[in-house]
Amino acid sequence: MVMPGYKQTEIGVLPDSWDTITFEECFTILPNNTLSRAELNYNGGEVQNIHYGDILVKFPAVLDCSTEGLPYINKENVSKASKGFLRDGDLIMADTAEDVIVGKSTEVIGIGDSKIVSGLHTIPCRPRDAEMFAPKWLGYFINYCTYHDQLIPYITGIKVSSVSKSAISSTVIAVPPKPEQEAIAEALTDIDTLIVNLEKLISKKRAIKQGAMQELLTGRRRLPGFDGEWKEAAMDLYVDFQVGFPFSSAYFNSNSDGLRLVKNRDLKSDDQVYFTSEPYATEYVVENDDILIGMDGDFLPCRWQKGKALLNQRVGRLLPKKNLDVLFAYYALQKPLAELQNGTGATTVKHLSHGDIKKLIVLMPPTKEEQSAIAEILSDVDLEIEQLQLSLVKYMLVKQGMMSELLTGRIRLV
């Protein structure tokens, strides 16, 4: 049963006052070019180019060309480019990708006097009736699942996915009254601005942290109250390195039976969490703030914060001696471990040994107290970054909720 004031359409239930239009009715297809990355530069030129790879991984639903650094076409290749220069309100769709993200699009604004063309593996589109759409509406709607899910039956290819102009011609676009489009676009722009500003702040905090690490972990900057000479020392003077136990996969489960296992991949994500009901020795129990290091692939240390767990094979734990603040070691080891990883032979998977850790050379302060003071400063910055990241996740979820309500007309702003 459709609620009063709404109607059933080809793309689901929409408000009575919303129209629908097919892709073919909506757009004129513009020419694109086939220039590769090698034929572009960021130094300057006459004509700029929108590359499909940037649409897929970098550009938002609405691309402000006045603020985004677009690449230029190399001077010797300008003649190869199409002369289909873009205008504000044009939509660029990526027609090729490695998965179902194919079809991701961006609406361009802020072009001004710039000469900008659409590049390789794109479908540049111009609304036939520019007055039908408020700025940014198409950018937001075309990227929402109500539209994008219509592309899925038309995706072809196995290793590389693609869609064609002809195949998507019958896909359907919702057209609210223009004042409502404007109100929806404004609301989504506001949340996008908040998200972008948070991302910039996180980047700034990370840069501050990086600078602080370079100063504090080398002794170039000393904290008040500390003096004495820093010296290089092998880590075996400061830590023992415990390697995890080879728990039997016969006891592995994903239904929380027993204790969680810490496997190599768990240091980076929670995509696949396993538990084990196997009896264990307490020496392999991991607690929050333990410093763990993956021994296959990425060697970067992890400050464990996911509760009581069991240390599985090919994951190691730093066991500090009395003269070491283990949190300082977490920060101090990041650079030498990265260098060790990058210097490892080009095998399919890189491996770290128990001896590799103990032989690492680290510049150490003369006292444990100075180690702790440095670690506290860096930990505070990490906490700030973590809180900002949590806020970012929250606002991204808010945006998803707004889109699901506003782009379907379930909530009306006008």
Where are these regions (language model features)?
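Low-complexity, Lys/Gly-biased intrinsically disordered segments
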Residues: 17-63, 77, 96-98, 232-269
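A short glycine-rich beta-alpha junction/loop motif
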Residues: 3-7, 16, 36-37, 44, ...
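Amphipathic alpha-helical coiled-coil/heptad-repeat segments
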Residues: 1-17, 170, 175-229, 364-414
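A short beta-sheet element
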Residues: 51-53, 62, 68-143, 263-265, ...
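Non-catalytic DNA-recognition/assembly elements of restriction-modification systems
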Residues: 3-34, 140, 170, 178, ...
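Short, solvent-exposed loop/turn positions at domain surfaces
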Residues: 8, 36, 79-80, 157, ...
